[in-house]
């Protein structure tokens, strides 16, 4: 028998859904086994995800489904769920994530072990068991993002301080919880007191970089952010955004610029910030071009089969 006794954690799990399909039901099923309260905020989904969810859990009093009626973005959805949460800890969880057995309990244990810890993340893995890049990372400063975007992190072994890769999944997995600069918004366990101190999610971000913004603000208020290596969560990354690559790319790059201007404008010369802005939009243009070429190739291949 597992030495970790099964119990529901004093956690409200907030899941922001937009067309997550059958994965939403799987996500909620795993969440109900570990947390006191599940809040699903539906941002105007057009698929059957909510219908499947209500059919699977009729009369479940620990499940609260909130239909916003519009898609106001991930951060706004998180704040809607936060307003409805009743537990002392809140886990923001993507609908394409599956909590593994005892993962939430281990994250809560770390959060409760130090009153200075405001945010905890788990071990985000792909379906094949490999670690994803965003679960533990350094803050992507404009320079670090430039290094990452243009592949200069390959020079890290020669000049580690200059060409540092902010994704830490290439480093050995730690044997114990460690403090990090940032974790992924797909899996964030947060102390309510820390939220009251740092403030809610910034709703000016529609999609992407709002998690980094929150990590920065938590650190500015001296709250620790901790990565828990023995709390695995499977993340089917991109499930909700795969069908809208241009839309997602636009908001991702727009979010990057807001993040840089908000936190680094005073630290970098205006000329360098201008170059960073140019490089971000150049990267966006290349991303759009790649997607367009792929779509044209698929259409051409389909017509000739």
Residue ranges: model-predicted function:
Residues 15, 19-34:
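Short, well-formed alpha-helical segments that are part of the catalytic scaffolds
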Residues 30, 42-52, 70:
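A conserved acidic beta->alpha catalytic loop
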Residues 67-85, 106:
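Glycine-rich, basic loop-to-helix element that forms the pyrophosphate-binding segment
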Residues 90:
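Short aromatic/hydrophobic "clamp" motif used to bind/position activated sugar donors
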Residues 98-134:
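Conserved donor NDP-sugar-binding/catalytic core segment of glycosyltransferases
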Residues 139-180:
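Short, flexible, basic/aromatic active-site loop/helix in glycosyltransferases
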Residues 172-232:
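A short, conserved alpha-helix in the catalytic core of glycosyltransferases
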């Amino acid at each position: 028998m597992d030495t970790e006794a099964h119990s529901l954690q004093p956690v409200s799990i907030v899941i922001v859904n937009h067309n997550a399909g059958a994965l939403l039901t799987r996500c909620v099923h795993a969440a109900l086994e570990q947390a006191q309260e599940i809040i699903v905020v539906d941002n105007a989904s057009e698929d059957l995800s909510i219908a499947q969810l209500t059919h699977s859990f009729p009369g479940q009093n620990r499940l609260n489904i909130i239909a916003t009626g519009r898609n106001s973005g991930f951060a706004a959805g998180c704040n809607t769920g936060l307003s409805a949460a009743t537990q002392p800890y809140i886990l923001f969880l993507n609908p394409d994530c599956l909590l593994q057995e005892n993962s939430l309990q281990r994250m809560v244990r770390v959060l409760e072990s130090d009153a200075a810890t405001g945010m905890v993340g788990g071990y985000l893995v792909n379906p094949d068991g490999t670690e994803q890049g965003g679960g533990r990372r350094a803050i992507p400063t404009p320079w670090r993002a430039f290094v990452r975007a243009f592949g200069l992190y390959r020079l890290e072994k020669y000049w580690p301080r200059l060409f540092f890769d902010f994704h830490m999944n290439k480093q050995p997995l730690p044997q114990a919880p460690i403090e990090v600069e940032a974790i992924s918004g797909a899996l964030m366990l947060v102390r309510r007191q820390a939220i009251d101190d740092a403030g809610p999610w910034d709703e000016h971000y529609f999609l992407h970089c709002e998690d980094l913004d929150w990590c920065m603000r938590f650190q500015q208020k001296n709250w620790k952010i901790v990565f828990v290596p023995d709390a695995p969560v499977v993340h089917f990354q991109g499930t909700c955004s795969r069908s809208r690559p241009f839309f997602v790319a636009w908001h991702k790059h727009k979010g990057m610029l807001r993040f840089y201007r908000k936190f680094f404008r005073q630290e970098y010369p205006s000329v360098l910030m201008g170059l960073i802005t140019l490089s971000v939009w150049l990267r966006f243009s290349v991303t759009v071009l790649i997607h367009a070429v792929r779509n044209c190739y698929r259409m051409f291949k389909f017509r000739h089969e």
